Design a protein with these regions (language model features):
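Long, charged N-terminal accessory/stalk domains
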Residues: 1-336, 364, 371-374, 378
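Conserved, carboxylate-rich catalytic/transport cores that coordinate ions
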Residues: 1-6, 18-21, 25-32, 276-637
Length: 637
């Protein structure tokens, strides 16, 4: 169901603002509405969050992979007390990070210098002495290998040194000749490069740079080791990060408030069933306040909160993946949950797969204690596994083995499955179509009820019930083939005809002229084809159920009838073969189960979204986002 909401208005003294916001945050009950500029007080809190996030990311490469397990628990006060010590750790990490960055910059600078000097290693002259004089032009640089010959022919004195694709070149010529041969030198691709203030020979500088690079690399290793030593502190930083995020959210909430020098005003949305709890929390802090709860006004952007029984709540994940219902409309979650449960089991339809899935999801919920969407998805899979256990017995297999094989020689040999998809595909298709028609009729009845609730009687009859009558009438035409009286088919014919006439005449009742109404009605009658298409959509239940069983049987045949048979003849080989085939068979079945589960989840959801929700559901709801503890690493007690 959609929880009724109230609009909260609270006025209190400014000195109690922090305590009141902490109390509201602790009960996670109020979504604030911005009513003014407020004060921009969250910059410092956001800065703390950013610093802690950066520190956590910095330590990630040095920390081991997170193990599976429930989140640790802590109180808000404990998390907030961790912030200052963690910020001190951040300061040390930031210092190390700066030194590592500087080290990297210095190392790269020396590597570049080393690379530029290596081609000159054979030149014995000190680099500071290689320069032009009053009468001689001296140039050092590089020339492409293909330009060497042309450079030698320019008329300048050229001395070549090391290099592969590019050669280091010392070019000397009289000053008075330089202007004439400079264009020829440039045409060879010669790029002049100076040694700057480097002193000593190239080989001496190469050795110096290599020594400095080695020292820098050793220093970097030490810095990295010091950084790695902080890895155990990562959990402390994570706790502090959650505490800082709580502070940040509370500080940001202040920006939504209006205030004077002595008082503040707060408005927001609160669940109707939480109003008294909000009042009690405020009364614990002060008795000087004004608090009012009002019903939403028309045009208000009211957030949507879903509340269902423990059994139905997991299916809210399926609804949320589609869209929350608009506030004041129908929550489709409890309405579609039984069908999702049944269809999922029929699609997976293998008892062993269902048992493994249910146990795995149960263990995930019990020991890892997920929250939010992950918890609900695990709940859906657990219930889907339970459904699969029974549907596998009724319509499917057991780890790819047919039930007649398992029950061979017993009284149940010809009892299960009730319908075998592989031997009676038409029977299974009829069952799927019947479930589909029931599913869609149920959706139309919900839409009819909604119309009656809003006193739209014509909508209830023409837009909804007439389609049930039309489809039912068409189905009744098959009555004689089922051994029923022809009068049933005759009644169905007239039921469909009368309903079709009503749709033709009144489906376009919103049009002002008769011609427009009739044209609209004729177009509406064409929707009968979409009904037929929707019924065919339920064939996917048969298709996925059949594929699960057939592929499971193929895996068993490959592993046991073919691969294991190749080991027969030698007892030792048979033992080795049995182990290999068992491991391979289990691995293949697990892989098959995972792939099939994904397909079942998606296709079952698709049937709810298109064939079911499409007939009555009003999407577009906005999620309720109260001020609360939005933590990532720790559950707040």
């Amino acid at each position: 169901m959609i929880v009724p909401m109230k609009k909260l208005t609270l006025a209190a003294l400014l000195e109690h603002r922090e305590a009141i916001l902490q109390a509201l945050q602790s009960i996670c009950a109020v979504q604030l509405i911005s009513i003014g500029e407020g004060e921009q007080s969250s910059a410092a809190a956001e800065g703390r969050v950013q610093r802690l996030q950066s520190a956590e990311e910095l330590l990630k490469p040095y920390a081991g992979k997170a193990g599976f397990g429930p989140k640790p628990e802590a109180t808000r006060q404990e998390l907030e007390e961790d912030i200052q010590p963690a910020l001190e750790i951040c300061a040390e990490l930031e210092g190390l990070q700066r030194r590592i960055a500087q080290n990297g910059s210095d190392t790269e600078k020396r590597r570049l210098q080393l690379g530029s000097l290596l081609p000159w290693a054979d030149m014995t002259d000190p680099l500071e002495k290689v320069h032009s004089t009053a009468s001689i032009k001296v140039m050092t640089g590089t020339v492409p290998a293909e330009g060497v010959k042309a450079l030698m022919e320019t008329g300048a004195l050229v001395q070549l040194y090391g290099g592969d694709k590019e050669r280091a070149a010392l070019v000397i010529c009289p000053n008075e000749e330089y202007a004439g041969i400079a264009p020829s030198i440039r045409a060879t691709g010669f790029q002049e490069k100076c040694f700057g203030d480097i002193r000593g020979t190239a080989s001496e500088n190469i050795q110096r740079l290599r020594t400095e690079i080695e020292a820098l690399e050793a220093e970097r290793a030490q810095l990295e080791a010091r950084l790695a030593a902080f890895a155990p502190k990562r959990e402390e930083i994570r706790r502090a990060l959650d505490g800082a995020a709580i502070d940040r959210d509370r500080e940001q909430s202040k920006e939504a408030l209006a205030h004077t020098n002595t008082a503040f005003l707060l408005t927001g949305w609160v669940r109707e069933d939480m109003t008294e709890k909000v009042r009690r929390e405020i009364e614990k802090i002060t008795d000087v306040y004004y608090l009012a709860f009002e019903d939403p006004s028309e045009g208000d952007a009211v957030p949507t909160v879903l509340k269902n029984s423990r059994l139905i709540t997991p299916y809210e994940a399926v609804t949320n993946l589609y869209s929350l219902p608009a506030y004041g409309t129908i929550d489709g979650t409890p309405l579609m949950a039984p069908f999702y449960f049944i269809f999922f089991g029929m699609m997976l339809s293998d008892t062993v797969y269902g048992a493994v899935l249910a146990l795995g999801a149960w263990a995930f919920l019990k020991y890892l204690k997920p929250t939010g969407m992950m918890k609900n998805l695990a709940g859906v899979l657990m219930q889907g596994g339970i459904s699969t256990i029974f549907m596998g017995l009724l319509f499917g297999t057991c780890a790819g083995v047919g039930w007649p094989v398992i029950f061979r020689g017993t009284a149940l040999e010809n009892t299960f499955p009730l319908i075998d998809s592989s031997t009676n595909p038409m029977g299974m298709l009829m069952v799927c179509a019947a479930f589909g028609i029931i599913h869609m009729f149920y959706a139309v009845l919900i839409a009819t009820w909604n119309c009656l609730k809003h006193k739209d009687y014509m909508g209830a009859l023409i837009d909804n019930m007439c389609w049930i009558f039309i489809v039912s009438g068409l189905i009744m035409q098959a009555a004689p083939m089922a051994g029923l009286s022809r009068s049933v088919a005759e009644f169905g014919k007239w039921l469909a005809i009368v309903s079709a006439v009503l749709v033709f005449l009144f489906a376009g009742r919103s049009k002002k002229n008769i011609a427009g109404r009739l044209i609209s009605g004729a177009g509406k009658l064409y929707d009968v084809t979409s009904w037929l298409g929707d019924v065919l959509s339920y064939a996917r239940i048969f298709a996925l159920g059949l594929s699960t069983g057939v592929i499971g049987m193929v895996l068993n045949t490959l592993c046991w009838d073919m691969l294991f048979a190749s080991f027969k003849g030698n007892p030792a080989l048979m033992l080795v073969g049995f182990i290999i085939v068992t491991v391979l068979s289990v691995a293949l079945h697990v892989f098959m189960m995972l792939i099939s589960t994904l397909g079942c989840f998606v296709h079952t959801a698709r049937l709810q979204y298109v064939e079911f929700f499409g007939k009555f559901y009003e999407a577009g709801g906005k999620a309720f986002r109260p001020l609360g503890y939005n933590t990532k690493y720790v559950n707040v007690k």
